[in-house]
Amino acid sequence: MCHDPDSGPPIPPIAGAAVSHDDVVLESADGNRFAAFAAGPDTPPRCGVVVLPDVRGLHHFYEEVALRLGEQGVAAVAIDYFGRTAGIAKRGEDFPYTDHVPQTRSAGVQADIGAAVAHLRTKAGAETVFTLGFCFGGRHSWLSAAGGHGIAGAIGFYGSTGPRNGEDGPIQRAGELRAPILALMGGADQAITADDVAAFETALAAAGVEHEVVTYDGALHSFFDRKQEQFADVSADAWRRVLAFLDAHTPG
């Protein structure tokens, strides 16, 4: 897995921020029902973000990410991937995600992202919507730029870039991406090599996709974790870049 059970996002809460949150169940166009966690400001949001977790699905780490976004005036919804194979129950620490990830296909994930985007637009009032993913979710965040969702940008932390489980990855589908890309990568990531990252950047450039690929020297996979104190400065910079990307691509 990407993060330990006691991991958390290295983002300090904003004291006094008025944020509402709730567990919700969303339904995709194909009829799939899946769990999600919605958070947002008590005032109209400046934009919306679909938060895409790692391979564990909807976990408290990503609920916290949604809350931190809400404190920034952003409507956020973190989604689970496994409604089709495991129902809408909460994912505990003993959830056998390794049984379900191989059954999770890109088309299904994109259908679920579409439902989350619609929720942010119709229920939360966010006209401009982004995706933000981590690891497994980073990959699907970038792919969502080819999903026909009309998103304003796709952000991914240490996502895989090539083929996986017989399906094309962001490199192979770079020509289909229709939104700016932000990639935040670890220079010491053993799962996603420097060659993988370079190939992704080359593919984006060749396809004419607006992009920024940032590699943090010495940072491991899943560096964005408050337990990883050695990467505190890296994580702070990455979070600043996330917020700056949202600002840069939100009209007005």
Task: Kindly give the residue locations of the regions a language model identified.
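N-terminal cap/leader regions of alpha/beta-hydrolase-fold enzymes
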Residues: 1-252
